Every structure is written in C-alpha cells, then in structure tokens.
C-alpha cells in the first residue's frame, strides 16, 4: 500500500502515516531527494533549506519525534527540509535544514524532555576546515567504565558500580561520587590498572574516525572523569593531541584511595574544550564534543 496521498494536486506524506521505524522510510520517501516539513506532512521538494541545521540521533528515534519537532517548528514560524534518513554506528539519525537559525528553538529544545539527542546548529562542522573533537572516554571512546573494572578486580565491584550509575544519571555530584568510588579502592595493587588497560575494548570505528579527522587537520582530545592511566594508553595508540583525566594516587605499589590534583569534572571538561579551541585557533562552529553522561553536558553545551 502506497502511503502517499494527493492534496490539491500535490503528493504528500502525512506524518501520521510515516512508518514508525526509520529503516522503512527509504521506500516510503524514495520519490524525492528531500522533503519540506510542515506541521502535518512532508511535501516533495526540489531544493532544501541549508541556512541552519537540526540533528536528531538516538536508538529510539522514530516518526513520532519528527512529528513533535514539526509542531515546535510551526509554532516558531520556521521552515525545514528533511534529508534522507540515515544512521551512524547503527544508530538512527535525521538531518534537517532550516531557513534560519533560531535561538528560540535552541532554548525550546533544551527546556523539553526528549529520549533522544537533538540539537539546532547555525552551521555543521566540516572536514574542509581545521576542527577540534573532544571526547569523553569511558563508555564513549571505549566500551567499559574503567573504574568499575578496577573495582571488580579489587573485590568491590557492586559497591562502585552502584555509585557510578547514580553519577552518570546526575543523581550525585560527580566530584563527590568519584571520591567515594576511589576511596573503596584503597589498598588495591596498582598492577590491576595494567590488567584493565591490557583488555580495554575500543568503540567500533574509533581508530578510523581519529585517522580521518587527523588527516583532515583536526585535533582530537579526551576530557575524561576517568583516569590518566587509560587515557594515556589511548593517546599513545591513536596519536591524540591532548588528554585531560584524573590521576590515581599510589604509594608503595598500592592505590591510596585518593585522587592526586584537581578532579576533572563537568566544568573542567568544558574548560578543556575552550582551552584547546583557543590554543589551536579553532572557531566554535568547528568544535565537537562527544559524551554519554551528565558530566558531559557542560562540555557539549560550549
């Protein structure tokens, strides 16, 4: 059954008739290269808006998110064009071009609860100009939380994992949660750090991404609430330009249960991005921050 309908001689796709899964959109929207988004439907368009951008990204991304966004755009008098649906690392992604950048839309999206990632940008970063990528490490650049692995080897895995989960959800101040978790590691042999580092699984595509960015003249760094032992391992292996992470204090070959120096928290991550952008002469529109936890939000909002 063809979900397209005709209204006053114009073919259109009602948002309510879109397949729920983005994987099924290619067939339904194959008759046009891009689509004009209204509050009720998609209309085939020969040309797309590209003055500003909206990106939607997430495992749960579906037609309902686009319909909700359409209502928001209509309320603000914004026009938008939908580009073909895609995915990155197996996660659905939608890209829309708008007729102008709207600070009001930025604030409206921030004020609402969404179960996906989305943002409104004045410009998309490009590989044709110098840029800066700053990544979180644990569960972002790598597939584990290093402190949980250390704790497991030290015999306090369950206690530390519970605090980690609360911290990632923003239920605890990051600095306090880190001190509490590290304190549980007191007396553990420093050699367990080597065990974790030796079996540290990278996110799929990480080396390729870094290589492509470096070839394009981008700078790549890590700003992590994790530890220098592991961030340093990534820096050596991937040729990262900088790392910001916490240093575990050690005495006599044992962890003391404390962190040496200032803690890298949300504010420190944001400062790291700003510092590197200034040092490397990278404009704000060419900076990208990537993270998965509450302590990454300030960095991602720079």
How should each PLM-predicted stretch be described?
Residues 125-172:
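Active-site neighborhood of HAD-like aspartate-dependent phosphohydrolases
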Residues 188-191:
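Cytosolic catalytic headpiece of P-type ATPases
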Residues 2-42, 194-302:
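C-terminal cap/substrate-recognition subdomain and adjoining C-terminal extension
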Residues 63, 99, 141-144, 157, ...:
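Electropositive phosphate-/nucleotide-binding environments in soluble metabolic enzymes
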Residues 1-135:
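Non-catalytic pre-domain segments flanking phosphatase-related domains
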Residues 180-185, 197:
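Long, charge-rich alpha-helical interaction segments
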Residues 162-166, 178, 209:
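Short coil/turn segments at secondary-structure boundaries
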């Amino acid at each position: 059954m063809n979900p397209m309908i005709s209204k006053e001689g114009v073919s259109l796709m009602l948002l309510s008739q879109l397949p729920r899964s983005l994987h099924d959109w290619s067939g339904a929207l194959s008759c046009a290269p891009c689509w004009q988004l209204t509050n009720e439907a998609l209309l085939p368009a020969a040309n797309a808006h590209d003055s500003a951008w909206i990106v939607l990204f997430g495992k749960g991304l579906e037609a309902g998110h686009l319909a909700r966004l359409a209502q928001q755009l209509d309320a603000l008098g914004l026009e938008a064009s939908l580009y073909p649906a895609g995915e990155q690392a197996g996660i659905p992604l939608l890209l829309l071009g708008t007729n102008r950048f709207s600070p009001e839309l930025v604030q409206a999206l921030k004020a609402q609860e969404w179960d996906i990632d989305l943002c409104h940008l004045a410009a998309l970063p490009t590989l044709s100009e110098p840029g800066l990528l700053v990544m979180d490490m644990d569960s972002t650049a790598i597939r584990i939380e290093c402190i949980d692995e250390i704790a497991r080897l030290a015999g306090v895995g369950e206690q530390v994992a519970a605090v980690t989960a609360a911290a990632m959800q923003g239920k605890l101040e990051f600095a306090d949660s880190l001190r509490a978790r590290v304190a549980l590691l007191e007396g553990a042999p420093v050699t367990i750090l080597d065990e974790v580092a030796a079996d540290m699984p990278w996110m799929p595509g990480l080396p390729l991404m870094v290589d492509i960015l470096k070839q394009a003249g981008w700078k790549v760094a890590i700003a992590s609430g994790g530890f220098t032992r592991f961030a340093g391992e990534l820096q050596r292996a991937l040729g990262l330009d900088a790392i910001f992470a916490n240093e575990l204090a050690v005495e006599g070959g044992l962890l003391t249960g404390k962190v040496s120096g200032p803690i890298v928290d949300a504010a420190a991550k944001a400062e790291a991005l700003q510092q590197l952008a200034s040092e490397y002469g990278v404009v704000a529109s060419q900076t990208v921050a990537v993270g998965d936890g509450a302590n990454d939000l300030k960095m991602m909002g720079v």
